[in-house]
Amino acid sequence: MIKIISSCIAVFLFSTAVAQNAAPILQATGNQVYCPQSSLPIVTNMSITDPDDVGIAAMYIQISSGYVLGQDVLTLTGVHPTITSSWNATEGKLTLSGVSGDPTYLQFKAAIESVVFTNSAINPSGQRIFSITVGQANYLESTGHYYQYVPNTGISWTNAKNAAAASTYYGLQGYLATITTVEEVQISGVQASGAGWIGGSDEANEGVWKWVTGPELGTTFWNGAVNGSSPTFAFWNANEPNNQGEEDYAHVTAPGVGQPGSWNDLSNVGASSGNYQPKGYIVEYGGIPGDPILQISTTSIITIPVITNVTSATRCGSGAITLQATSNIGSINWYTTPTGGTPIFTGNSFTIPLLNVTTDYYVDAFPVGCTLGNRVQVTATIKPVPVIGFTTPNPVCQNTNTTLQANTSLGVLNWYDSNTSVTPIFTGTTFTTPNLSTSTTYFIEAISNGCPSNRLAIPVQVVPAPNVVDETVVFCENTSVTLQSGISGSSYLWSTGATTQNCAVGSAGTYS
């Protein structure tokens, strides 16, 4: 009987303990565009719900992706009498904690909505993801996992592996971190409060490095030594892994040793002092079968707009022209000046209905009114079209040639024998025709910098030769006779020099 009662009491107590451990649910709203040199709230709205608590000791906001040390800062603004803030530049993390006692969730909501992001660079770039969580572990949205550095100077890799496996975080099972992306390098190494052991080893097979903890258990991430290769992802420091003295375990390098967040191989115990003495280990939480589904973290995003591509345009002569621009986020604003002013158009494709001269336009994707963001130039080029002309030619006699004159304001002048010909018969301003038997039309066109003029026709009139008949005229000596051309309405030139239709002569001879 006593055993039955004890069993019931035990079950009752277990049930009560589970109910008291309900985790809060966090939900942030915010996907915003940042204007350089400004301060922008990291969220547009924050929601915190908890079925059994009204407050908590502290909350943490970290720039978990895209963080730039020395430029990015999170600041609590406004008046919050129950909450104090502390910024850790190394981790890119702002801690909000109670002045005395636990602030309420409503007070934390107001504080989080008052946290602003600033960047000191003149031309910042990239995207920032902000992780808001109730625990000290770093949260990475892309994996949904948590990462926590545990200081423990001199701890061996084996003991660190066991300690990590014995750790839990809001019900999530811990393990030595398995780092499989650049983002994980940043959050678990570069932005961690210290460096230490991670879950990689080649103890089982020298030169074959595997993850031996967590969901990636058994996954090979490196083959070989210093000059090896990775089938997936690895982030060894320069000249690592070098296996100097049974170094079979992966460790994040100490600050100041090589590239931040990179790895080196150490023995199970490492060095007894200095940079290669283990100072702790990195525990990762998440991804283990049976882990609870939690909402103790939430994220928001701020993106710094960047013009990713512009397409200038060129046309010959006045007319409509279309320019293009794209950005990573936001709407494209078009301006006539590199700074200041108001947009003349918003959109990716900008058409100017009539443009007469080459004009520079400027684009950005910042919110309207953002005056400090860089604009990118897009040029609409109007290339001049040549203006051509010619001297009207005189009629020419049949079976003779003539010289034609033309001119152009720009470029090269080409002559064609038809309006649709593509191959010129002559290039230049003075063209001598071949002998012409019939009236002929030539065409001229100039081209300058790829821009052709309209083609102009130059008609050449060919006048048939007069049909002259030979004639013998008899007249008396010491008299004169008038020779008749027999053709009227023409110009005349006799062999005597006369220029009239008829010609008087007084001596025998041959006249033409």
List where the protein language model places each region.
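Generic recognition of long tandem-repeat/solenoid scaffolds
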Residues: 91-102, 146-149, 250-252, 323, ...
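Extracellular, disulfide-bonded carbohydrate-recognition/adhesion ectodomains
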Residues: 120-305
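Extracellular glycosylation-rich, acidic/polar low-complexity regions of adhesion-
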Residues: 20-142, 255, 263-265, 285-307
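Structured loops at beta-to-helix junctions and adjacent beta-edge loops in soluble globular domains
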Residues: 64, 99, 135, 200-203, ...
